[in-house]
Amino acid sequence: MPLRLIFMGTPDFAVPTLLELAGHGHEIVAVYTRAPKPGGRRGLALVPTPIESEARRLGIPVLTPKTLKTEEALAEFRAHEADAAVVVAYGMILPQAILDAPKLGCYNLHASLLPRWRGAAPINRAIMAGDAESGVMVMKMDVGLDTGDVAMAELLAITDAMTASDLHDKLSRIGADLMVRAMAALERGGLTLTKQAEDGVTYAAKIEKAEARIDWTKPAHAVLRHIHGLSPFPGAWSEITIDGEAVRLKILRCALARGTGEPGTVVDDELTIACADSAIRITELQRAGKSPMKAADFLRGTRVAPGLRFG
């Protein structure tokens, strides 16, 4: 029979999993998410998380505790009498007492091929590191940082054209299907768990804005992966002086291109920029305070002459 589930998640990445579980007949008895944050044009309105919005649309009770470490929070969690909890980018550490509360445990959807890229930013780090593949895994949670036993996995190739946004969306959809399959196996009593490998562990540290500046002295492929790994947020950037004005541009998409010159130098009329070995051609960018735009549209209004230099 269908499982009684607690769902715990916050951002857009978690929404497909919530919708798929609800659509497959499981009884989602409560949704835990982060509290609404100030937003809107003046920051005066409280904006709910994407998960809260979807849960309320589905008529599921929503809880937004500041902590799960109090006796009151634990008692409330236990009172749901859930078979299992599904956790997708919740953003809060679950203490052992919470992990032990559901009859069959807590199951996390993680956007990497564990034990590679444990931590906060696995999608960004996989692209930035030049990884050939990524994926999603369902693991039974323990108190460690993404150290639980793995139940299921799905792999996905990373192409040079993929941005963090592209990979995020693909893994979100694949992960939703994977979690549905995992919960079906759990319901049947046939979910097999495998310990993570002890070697190959890497950590996906949170992305800092200080990392975003582009280093044109690196090889072109590394520059491309850096740009795509930070697109759209926080956005890899560089500055160039045009008509005496220093202009900061976020580079959102690019492609490998032919060209040589001093790193950072514009080598043609199509925004091809020299790197250490060859070049990249910018295809999408964003000027400060403006909307993202195709490079071709930018060049219609702004001349970036060969010989100018990004830095």
From Swiss-Prot:
The UniProt record lists the EC number as 2.1.2.9
Q: Binding of (6S)-5,6,7,8-tetrahydrofolate: at which residues?
A: 112-115
Protein family according to the UniProt entry? Belongs to the Fmt family.
Query: Which of UniProt's keywords are assigned here?
Result: Protein biosynthesis, Transferase
> GO CC annotations?
cytosol
Protein name, UniProt field: Methionyl-tRNA formyltransferase
The cross-references to Pfam families, in alphabetical order and at most eight, read: Formyl_trans_C (PF02911), Formyl_trans_N (PF00551)
HAMAP family from the entry? Formyl_trans
Free-text function comment from the UniProt entry: Attaches a formyl group to the free amino group of methionyl-tRNA(fMet). The formyl group appears to play a dual role in the initiator identity of N-formylmethionyl-tRNA by promoting its recognition by IF2 and preventing the misappropriation of this tRNA by the elongation apparatus.
Q: Which residue ranges run through the membrane? A: none
The reply to whether Transferase figures as a keyword in the UniProt entry is yes
**Domain of life assignment:** Bacteria
Which reaction is catalysed here? L-methionyl-tRNA(fMet) + (6R)-10-formyltetrahydrofolate = N-formyl-L-methionyl-tRNA(fMet) + (6S)-5,6,7,8-tetrahydrofolate + H(+)
MF annotations from Gene Ontology? methionyl-tRNA formyltransferase activity
